[in-house]
């Protein structure tokens, strides 16, 4: 080979010129060995690419991917064709400002697929670790572990304003409304709710959106060393590890402080007094309607349950309360007095469509710091409201949710949002824009038409009673069939008794949860309430919905008169939403 300066020679020829020179000095056998080594390296690289593509497909990142082997074969054929077509063409892969060539695009796609697969695997590991702890329905009457963990972390819960929400029903919907109102004013928001529908990440939301997978993983890794310390401290004193819900609460408060949020909207897990969330100072306390639920842990009477829930009221706090049963009201008033708190309470009763609260009563409510739903009108996709607070009257507010109970949830949310600004009225346009954006997945949600299929997460008689009123008001279906499953600790007879007058039949179905009631037990109770001639069962949700639709459509009435209601649990609501392609 000439010693002349090689500049001017195509750089891609360097390795071939050098290889030719080396062949003068080494044996043919050695050259063959090197060629085999190069081929092996290339084969390994191709296999690595194939595995990355497999991860991409298996992870469902390619929509409608179909059969895995067929997709892989097709992708490999496409890649081979791409490279064959480029074999005799100049390399333009790096031409153009900031525009990657096709080769780079392939590499980037494969790298992204591998990265996302790694994130999914790590998220599954983190979730498994958290879920290995005591479940959230096993209340541990102590805040010591949580307070110790937060103290180690610098008490992140003290860095933001908070709205703390308890009650038996309506907590999540109210939380979502408060968050939208706060966000509409320009505040950075955090939201902590439970349980989740589709992913554990829903429980911790920033600016209305679930925390990212990477963010959830990072939050766990930030607090894990502290959780380990607290577990060890508790074990040393004969106590339990931190529970599933305690860990999530610590993660949420840490995320909110790091983001940082201006306000956190925090829903209690269960009860209030001993709930892990109850370490917030000077939070606005919201108490939605109280009824019987979780009686094993909270008490067997409304008064006992209300006592536990009123435990979130802190000295000097503003308390926003729904209208309550007499026993619950007594407990709330006592807690307000003990803490010298300011009470703003819903004083309006049920307001039917096209009716308006008496103007004198409306004025009296405002003068006494009361709250009221002054009027409701039916609207396509929801309802139009007039809401009265101590600060203002808000007219022509569109709420894209059904049911009078959602109107009252909106009233509580509005008063809570006002409390963040010293009780002052919010601009009407902000209120209208915020409520128009509200969603509440799995709460009287229409997932299909023809026939109408509704999904609701209601699981206790108190919530189902409110739902029944909303159904009769907004969905006047002549032929409604219920698809039902429930957790074993729920009042199944009470729930079915509420729905029996408006449902022609019930289809019982098993549910994917270790806490679910056995199908045979469910059918037995349904037989007692509906009569065996109106009870059916199916082994899976797909068949249950199909059977329910057939039963609902069996009459000669027009199709809009028929419907299916899927109800009984958040778990069932999630499975139903996924069945109809809804995961957000």
Predicted regions: what is each one?
Residues 1-167, 174-185, 192, 232-239:
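Short functional linear segments
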Residues 7-27, 34-35, 45-50, 56-59, ...:
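Acidic, Mg2+-coordinating active-site environments of NTP-dependent enzymes
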Residues 118, 137, 143, 147-151, ...:
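ATP-dependent carboxylate-amine ligase catalytic core
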Residues 178, 273-283, 577-580:
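Short Gly/Thr/Asp-enriched flexible loops that form oxyanion-binding sites at enzyme active sites
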Residues 256-262, 423, 474-478, 548-563:
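Glycine-rich phosphate-binding loop signature in dinucleotide/nucleotide-binding domains
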Residues 263-266, 275-286, 290-292, 304, ...:
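Nucleotide phosphate-binding/pyrophosphate-handling subdomain across enzymes
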Residues 325-343, 452-454, 461, 496-562:
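C-terminal helical cap/extension that packs against the catalytic core
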Residues 569:
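Active-site-proximal loop/hinge segments that shape catalytic or ion-binding/gating pockets
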